[in-house]
Swiss-Prot record:
Protein name per Swiss-Prot or TrEMBL: Uncharacterized protein PB1A10.13
Keywords, ordered alphabetically: Cytoplasm, Phosphoprotein
Compartment(s) where it occurs, according to its Swiss-Prot or TrEMBL record: Cytoplasm
Residue ranges of coiled coil: none
Source organism, top-level taxon: Eukaryota
The keyword Phosphoprotein is annotated on this UniProt entry: yes
Species, as recorded: Schizosaccharomyces pombe (strain 972 / ATCC 24843) (Fission yeast)
GO cellular component entries: cell division site; cell tip; cytoplasm
Segments of skewed composition (Basic residues): 83-95
Length: 529
């Protein structure tokens, strides 16, 4: 607030101290106003001009002593309506309301052109003094007689006449003062606007200078102007936050996990988690990898035959980062991550969970640790359950992994495999409730559930069997009726990753693991602040 405005506010309050009220108090409805209260010291950060208007209307209120509290409240309600809802409940402007009533009366009384013109000017006169910022006390601007208080309730013809005389007599004087005041007002507005422009432009220039120098240190967020902050927020992609390694460690493992090379399974997941970033960003950040990492307008989906083919080539041992078809380049990063031992990967997952990085680490492959020569179908199922799924909008192709395999083959192979589940003594009801039907989608949904159940038994032995059983029951009961298991909160936070068939209303959801959820929350928080 400028100092001149503050001065005016103070003057207005001094003139109307009789009618002002304690700071921060709002008038309750149908409550008569107290006769004397202390003037507000400061109204906090509320609109300053609202305060000015309040002061002015209070000063004009001193004459309206005949009104009861209810009538005043009614009047204030109509006033709020007239001023487009901007007015405080306590900024009452009776002159405006009364004059409009009188104008209507005048028009009904006689329809002469001169009278109509008079009415117009009187209405203007009574509306415009609200903008008056110069006069110390507005009692002179609104010469309202006590008899006028009747006009709102008893609409007598005599009071109307009196009111007309009063308004027409002061019209000229009022117009003179208001024109002066309004010109001053516009001047102050112009100066403040230019000032704000200047203020906004300075941090921008600083940003540009820093960019020219090539320094990596960002400008503190607090020093940016609001426009600059908005621009910054629009330019940064949603999940790409600054990667802060935990405990100031910068090891190769972390770098591999944070920015995987193009063509790894993790990179496919990253494509689903991240919006398409413009090409110039990747180029400026890492010129070395910009050639390998294709800029995607839409997240590209890995076609399933390639997954199957990779599984066959690797002898069933599917690594976390097996190169997919759409990028043939095997970068050193991919080799690094594939040569890691399973225990290392587990460590990376646990260490990386709370940090803010743009990739999703989904729990290490149990097939890698448990059975190196697993069957191809199991491998595909587990891989499929790991890849983040997303509804792509057209039709029902929201499954990532196995979309293009012909249905009959898939059903045959899966129904052959799935009933054999010797590894789960903790879940007696699993095989009975989720034996696959002949229907294509249901059978492989059940298979996915079972494989993920098995994986959860491997990955998180800490989960209690009863908890797991209840989760499993909630899944299979649903999937036996219509192949889209709803995941409950319990299943969401149970620690084990789950295959979730997307229903119509669900968001793009990964296989829900606790680490991933925590990471998303963290990234969202950092992307906001």
């Amino acid at each position: 607030m400028s100092s001149s405005k503050i001065k005016e506010l103070r003057e207005g309050l001094m003139s109307s101290s009789k009618w002002s009220m304690a700071p921060g108090m709002m008038m309750q409805q149908n409550q008569p106003r107290p006769a004397t209260t202390t003037p507000p010291i400061s109204r906090g950060n509320e609109d300053a001009d609202e305060g000015l208007n309040t002061a002015r209307s209070f000063s004009s209120f001193q004459d309206l002593k005949g009104m009861s509290g209810d009538a005043k409240e009614q009047e204030s309600a109509t006033l709020v309506h007239l001023t487009k809802g901007r007015a405080h409940p306590r900024s009452r402007r009776p002159p405006r309301q009364i004059s409009i009533d009188s104008a209507k009366k005048e028009e009904t009384k006689n329809t002469g052109s001169t009278k109509a013109a008079d009415t117009k000017s009187s209405v203007e006169a009574t509306i415009s003094p609200l903008k008056d910022t110069k006069s110390p006390s507005n009692a002179s601007v609104f010469p309202i007689k006590p008899t006028e208080s009747k006009t709102s309730t008893t609409k007598d013809s005599e009071t109307a006449k009196e009111e007309d005389d009063a308004s027409s007599s002061t019209t000229k004087a009022v117009e003179a003062t208001t024109s002066k005041a309004s010109s001053a007002h516009t001047d102050t507005l112009a100066t403040s606007a230019s000032n704000s422009d200047r203020g906004a432009s300075t941090p921008e220039m600083v940003v540009k200078a820093e960019k020219r120098e090539g320094s990596t240190s960002p400008i503190p967020y607090s020093s940016l102007s609001i426009a600059e902050r908005i621009k910054q927020a629009q330019n940064t992609p949603f999940l790409e936050s600054k990667v802060l390694p935990q405990n100031n460690e910068t090891s190769d493992e972390e770098n591999v996990d944070v920015k995987p090379a193009a063509g790894t399974v993790k990179n496919v997941m990253q494509a689903f988690l991240q919006p398409a970033t413009p090409a110039k960003d990747t180029a400026s950040k890492e010129p070395s990898k910009s050639s390998q990492q294709p800029v995607r307008t839409k997240p590209r989906i890995a076609q399933s035959p390639f997954l199957a083919q990779d599984a066959k080539e690797n002898g069933g041992n599917v690594e976390v980062s097996s190169p997919l078809s759409f990028s043939a380049s095997k970068s050193p990063a991919a080799v690094d991550s594939s040569t890691k031992t399973p225990t290392e990967q587990v460590n990376v997952v646990s260490k990386q969970a709370p940090t803010t990085s743009s990739t999703s680490v989904i729990s290490p492959d149990p097939l890698q640790t448990a059975a190196p020569s697993a069957n191809v179908n199991e491998v595909i199922a587990s891989l499929e359950s790991k890849v983040v799924t997303r509804r792509t909008g057209s039709g029902n192709n929201y499954r990532v992994g196995l979309r293009n395999v012909s249905g009959s083959e898939r059903t045959k192979s899966l129904s052959k495999e799935s009933p054999v589940e010797p590894e789960k003594p903790a879940l007696p009801d699993a095989t009975s409730s989720s034996t696959p039907t002949t229907e294509n989608k249901e059978s492989w949904t059940n298979q996915g559930i079972k494989s993920s159940q098995q994986r959860s038994a491997n990955a998180s032995p800490a989960t209690s069997p009863s908890n797991q059983a209840s989760i499993h029951a909630s899944f299979t009961k649903e999937s036996s009726t219509h192949s889209s298991p709803s995941f409950t909160l319990e299943s969401l936070f149970s620690g084990a990753p789950r295959v979730v068939e997307l229903t119509r209303f669900s968001q793009p959801s990964p296989a829900c693991s606790r680490a991933l959820l925590a990471r998303w929350k963290e990234e969202y928080r950092t992307s906001i602040h």
